[in-house]
Structure formats: C-alpha cells, structure tokens
Amino acid sequence: MTNQTRNVVVVDCLRTPMGRSKGGAFRHTRAEDLSAHLMKGILARNPQVNPSEIEDIYWGCVQQTLEQGFNIARNAALLAGLPIEIGAVTVNRLCGSSMQALHDGTRAIMTGDAEICLIGGVEHMGHVPMNHGVDFHPGMSKNVAKAAGMMGLTAEMLGKLHGISREQQDEFAARSHARAHAATLEGRFKNEILPTEGHAADGTLFQLDYDEVIRPETTVEGLSQLRPVFDPANGTVTAGTSSALSDGASAMLIMSEEKANELGLKIRARIKGMAIAGCDPSIMGYGPVPATQKALKRAGLAIEDMDVVELNEAFAAQSLPCAKDLGLLEVMDEKVNLNGGAIALGHPLGCSGARISTTLINLMEAKDAKYGLATMCIGLGQGIATVFERP
C-alpha cells in the first residue's frame, strides 16, 4: 500500500442492451454469457490494455444462485477466456452491487493494491427471479417491519410521507419512456451499448443493439388506467410507475490516472467522491439522499455543482421524494435522467449501478459537463452515490 491515495479514472464503460425478462431476447442467454461478452467487448475497445495487467474483476450480482451462483465474476472471466491470473469476486449490496464493485475497485487502485481493475455487474431477472429463495430471519421483525422486505410497499410509504400524487408518478413514468425512446432514436445510447446476441420471437439469432424494454407508446392517460399493484385498496404505485423487469450487464474499465496516461488512453471521468448510507428499511428508497450528501461533502462540492444526475428509478414514488429533498425537482429537465431511467430501461439489480454510471458519463461528454452524480436506493434501507469529474 502507498501512503498517498491516487486519482482513479474511468477509461471506458459499456453495457448490454436491456432485454425484457419475460420472453425477451435474452431468454436463452445466460447471465455468464452477458457478462463474458461485455468483459471481452470492453477489452477489445481498449487494445492498449494488456489483460494480464488487470489485478481484479469486481462484478455485482444480487441473486447469487443457479447460473448466477458460485462466484459468477470468476465464471464469466473464465468463460471469456481472460488470463487465469486475473482475480475475480462477486459483490452484493443488493441494488447497489455494481456501484459497490466500482467503489471496491477504486479503493484498491487508490491504495496502490491495483493499477487496473475491471468492474461491472449482471442480473438475469428472467432466469433468476428477484424473490427466488428469499428467506428472512423471523427475528428481524423485532427491528424491521415485515413489509420493509417488499420494495413496492416501501415505495408506497415514501410516496405517502412526501405527498407524491398518483398523477405525479404517472407523469414521471411517461417521461422516462419518452426520454429513453428519444435517446434510442437519436443514437444517444449508441456509444454505451455493445450489440449482444439474442433470440428473436421466432427463435432465430440476431444482434440486439437497442433496449427492448422501452414502451414508446406509454402515455399518462394509459398509465392512469393501471391499478395499484402493491396496495390495491389504498395505493398509488402501479406496475407502470415501477422499474421494469429486465436482463442486462454493465462494465467499466478503471485504472490509476498515471497508468491511463502511460498507456495513452483517454480519461473519460475521474472518481471524485463515493459514499454509502443507511436509512429506515421501511423507506429504503430514501437512501440516495444521505448517500449523496456524504459523497458531495467528501468531494468538496454541492448539489448545485452537479451538471448531470442519474438517480436510479426504482419507483416514481421513490425517485420524486429523493429529487425533492436533494433540491433537484426544479432542474429535472436540465439535469436529471435525461435519457430516461429504470422505469423504461429496467433495473437488473446487479447491473444497474455501473449502468447508470455509464449512461451518466456519456451524458456528461455530450453536454461537455464538468461534474456528474450517480446515485441509487438499496433494498432494506441503504443508499449509494458516486460523484464523477471530467478532466
């Protein structure tokens, strides 16, 4: 370890298209395949990097069982044919897993334990459902409401506490689909999506190069017809205002600033600040607020300094209170989730942290922005945030 921490930079970031979990293009594609494809793809885009110099792979994944079990990070690296000397570990901080992978890799480089790390994450929610094998200890109910394990009910609770109306949620969800669809049509996702083999409806193989989860036909009127799904009698949260179920993977290539300069690689962003925070599990969706406040303080910046923000859209009823308390509601159209978010693209749990960071970096470049924030809520009451700076 060195005594002085070093600057850590992102030299590239990439993701698969988001596949629909129910009968989508990746229905015959395993989570390891999505991961291995990205690992190979990001290295192919950066031939200056000798794979043997990668110290470790940190890969987020939540449901670590079945095809995602037994250290999927290592399994995917072996499947990709990467040098056997590279280490690999699977990281789990639920929804924040691949952002946690970014933080872990960043710290390893900061302290001098690594020069180059590959980070990312995956979740195939079609093959391994979110609730597969979940078995909470009954004694937890002494400290945590049972409903805190039901994400939709925590969104209902947070929405009620902050007076978020059904209409506001429907408008936010329609915005997500509209912006994601516009981003697709205008090619704004092109640089971040690695075309990935999938199966068409008739079973033939094809290269998927767009997010098939987006519903361009979504309207506020259409959403208003949906029934509340978690609290049918009194609720406001519907399937339409919740993040879609999707399958996908994301990856980022990070290294010390010195190494990037030595290899002649373009520095796309620096990691400027990182934080996690806990909050009441019953309003787990509020986690981005304390996590962002911590990360900004560590970066010596304020929310007003952020030119672009990616706030993971677990639920509209959760995103809006966070945006409100972070002081972002007035600048939504200039700064927040400009290419839509998880309501349109889906929230493959282990993938999303690096996914929103990848989208953020591409948006920062498109807007010639200096600072950006990526933040997300985490089941059972946590938040995670990363502040990025463009050189």
Curated annotation (Swiss-Prot):
Catalytic activity as recorded in UniProt: an acyl-CoA + acetyl-CoA = a 3-oxoacyl-CoA + CoA
Function: Catalyzes the final step of fatty acid oxidation in which acetyl-CoA is released and the CoA ester of a fatty acid two carbons shorter is formed.
Domain of life: Bacteria
Subunit organization: Heterotetramer of two alpha chains (FadB) and two beta chains (FadA).
Gene name tied to this protein: fadA
GO biological process, one term: fatty acid beta-oxidation
Keyword Lipid metabolism attached: yes
Gene Ontology CC annotations of this record: cytoplasm
This enzyme's EC code(s): 2.3.1.16
Family note: Belongs to the thiolase-like superfamily. Thiolase family.
GO molecular function, one term: acetyl-CoA C-acyltransferase activity
Name of the protein in its database record: 3-ketoacyl-CoA thiolase
Keyword tags: Acyltransferase, Cytoplasm, Fatty acid metabolism, Lipid degradation, Lipid metabolism, Transferase
Principal location class: cytoplasm
Cellular location(s): Cytoplasm
Pathway: Lipid metabolism; fatty acid beta-oxidation
Active-site annotation: C95, H347, C377
Main EC class the enzyme belongs to: transferase
